[in-house]
């Protein structure tokens, strides 16, 4: 699928209710400033388009937003989002059906709410049968309808631009059939209200696997279609409010027909029917039918997919024996749409649909932040969202801001969806074994509040899983486990460090590959070339250095959980991993290292390899007053392994007295007396410990640091100086977390 097809599909998801029905309702809330509401809404939705593009290139065949959210946040939030997405599409389809009824009636010269709903239900019945039988040609029909709509709307714009004379006041609203002065609050409400118009911008992401060069064409197609449809919305809303009075748009569900009739006048009538208006109505009906069909098609897939995932009753995942379509979920969806048409006010339908779409856009932006910052190994998108994470944060903040202005009913409805989703999950889906990336790797502030290891509230123990389920050959008596995730500069150096710091002899090296939960692990029974290469290299290291190294390759759905299980072995003394030494952990969310620091049962050694291959001088930098006996012992092991000299460094404030320095030096020297390697104590006065240690690291081969004893809110939210030592070090760095 080339770029033009991507643009056509994305446009097809937006051109419908957003231009043929919604502008009439929206115009009565803000008047001539309606075009500005569309423009601002498009800008605020842009980050969601970036985010959806990134997610789609990482999971091209996953099935869309529901799976993205389920993968990032887990089955519970997957259930909630699935229901929310389903309801949003149900509401949008119902809104489109009301528009179909309205456009049919204006052509027939009739005006009746009952007949409008009757016509809507007739068209819904036709769409229901079409989806049960299966309509393979619906996509091409939609493309032609969209093209025709664009051509006609362009003509309407140029025809109406010269006649637009009602552009003041800029802010106005219709209150009890009287035009009153509006304000910025009315504009903000309208911005949130028209979010529904852009709900289809990310629709094309669901078929990313069919797109040629998706890393380029998918985001480009989304952005271009968003720009095109925004131009259409802005242009048509400008000429609509400039030519049609707000009284004529009150409860008007066919505003473009009204605009066409006002522009053409009686000269375009044949037998009492305005030709231009009738032509617009026919194109509107065709486009809206396409919208309803796409809505039923997509929305029926959500309960179907959730049932397949064990989150809804089994009967929803059954397919029709003859037509092979999800007949049960299609029927449930169409019944819900019919009930919405019959019993809900049209304005409330649009408002609720917009609210649910706002929440989904927010969730998509949040999912990208979670997946990026947790560094899930399988998450490797071919397209990376620009301006990360600021674009996503902008999308989240503006979305929540506008959501508030939609009023209490949409907010309560969203709360109801959360409650319903939670009930359904605990009724049907609580046995699902998948967990989201956020739960596996840890949301840092949540970790700080709820999972922090304290004497008053011990951390929850990890679920015990038999290690034989990972691999029967994994050594149960290994003193150190070295997970190799593919980001190591030198796996050999990492294994050497593991051998140096542990007190036992055996080392277990594991090449761990994380794959998405929808991928069957049985597809990876054959050892990949990378693992075979690592096996050969570590075998050579074992022979040359006389080390007891076992190597195995492991495939898992949950990287951190697997590492935690491995470290839970009673004999495992150390978990040794490569580390990039990032000082900034991202906004609000930690990477897997943060999760491991709070959850693993063994000691943790993080090694940042700066390319040093000969270790002759080791610098141990510890804060004065720290319990440093364990660190000195480990540093001595490293020095003995490499036959290196040890320097114990304390950096103290400039105002420290000489008396205190002398006492500190005596105490530290006494701790080094029993070392079998060459060792010395160095104390430096400085109010810039990062700069001091960084400068001294140029004279050493390995810097050993401890993990800070406690976090504060600045470090929790934004990262802190604790990693700046590592980031600015000239030599390799070994950061140790010793469990008490």
Feature locations, PLM:
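Membrane-interface loop-to-helix entry segments
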Residues: 115-166, 181-182, 199, 222-227, ...
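TM-loop-TM module centered on a large, flexible mid-protein loop between adjacent transmembrane helices
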Residues: 67-68, 106-110, 177, 221-293, ...
